[in-house]
Amino acid sequence: MEIIKPISTIIIGLFLSIEFSFSSETNLIFTPFFSSTYYSSGSVFQPEKDGKTTITYFQLGAKKNTGAWSISGRFQFITATNLDSNSAFFNPDFNFEHRRGFYGSDNTWFESSSLIINYRNSEKFSVFFGKDRVQWGAGRSNLILSNHCPTYPLASFDWKISEKLNLQYFIASLESQISDSSQNELYSGRDIYVDRSIAGHRLKYSLLDKLTLSAIETVVFGNRKFDEHYLLPFIPFWSMQHYTGDVDNVQMCGEISWIPKDELKIYTSIFIDEWRPESTFDEQNRNWIGYQIGLKKNNFLQYNNKLLIEYTWTDHRIYRHKFSENSSYTYNFPLGFWAGPHAEEFIIIFNQKLGDWNFQSNISQVKRGELTEEMLDRQYSDPVIVYERYNGNLETRMIISAKAKKGILKNKLFLELEGQWIDWKNAGFDPYDSGRMGKDISKFSINLGLTASTQILFN
């Protein structure tokens, strides 16, 4: 890791001095990016009271528009010191696809990439494919599809059917991280994973100018990349899965978004996993749900600020499936709410811009409980054996933070200073291992960040 420090210094110097532009036609834009943050007591990246953590990003992005086509992508390389990789599964701002270590060192590195190729021939219809995430919902961390998981290969379209009605569809390939022993033998013992895929469609209807209703349905299916039953975007997946033997994982979500006045949005959504309509009101039902309610307000009390207040709650029976290859995860990260099932979060985020300064303050209270195999077996038993919420080992964490950020040198360089107070009960908790106990810690972390970015334009 010693070599990274002089390299970082050189890169920052280049970013501050370079801004090329060749010719005046449509540009191919490259965006090199560097960021490094020091956490004095590890923040939420390691479940100890003491111990500094450093995370450094090297990234190269590119984009190009030509006619109806647009292409954008990025490659990202991350290095980290004193990072507990398990902490990423309880952190909304960090995820990874491929984790590696340096030889002769405990330090870690990760790499990831994304790409979107978009074709739009009119304001009413567009098609895109590549490697990215689908994010459906108005919230910070949506219940059914959020941006807190790693990217995945996908193909999608967006069709504005009328002024009030919009349809979106996608199909994607996920990473199950379930070893396929039959394939491993063919590749000299290397890990080859069972296929897992997802298809989804969303119908949005503008009931009034300020009221929007959304109906979302997804299906996660394993042991195959594609399934012709789910290539039909206009038919409910709940009905189509009967043709596959009712073995797949169908999930539904409804959302209401209301803008009662300018600069204010109120939203709420409900998520239902493996719904059985005929038993909805029975004692033995499958009302496995999650729900979310929140609001976003711009210019709260004064100008140039944003306020977000959000509460999210998830049942322990959602996302996971009787057949593990059909669970709603990729790289072991949930596709929806970042804390996963059997969890809840209340969060307030306030952003204020004052001149060249940006200030952000957060209050987050999050809790999550066990997700054992016994609990999974019990939810599918007949009759169902009821599990009392949080009846066992659990983890809670409160974070109160304040951050200041300032751009200098024409906003090519940003400096950040953040203070975090963290009260963490059962830190290091593993929801899949009921016998593993963590620590109760309270700590204050001072976080120092530096970010450099510029654009290089070609024609």
Could you tell me what each predicted segment is?
Residues 8-19:
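Bacterial N-terminal signal peptides
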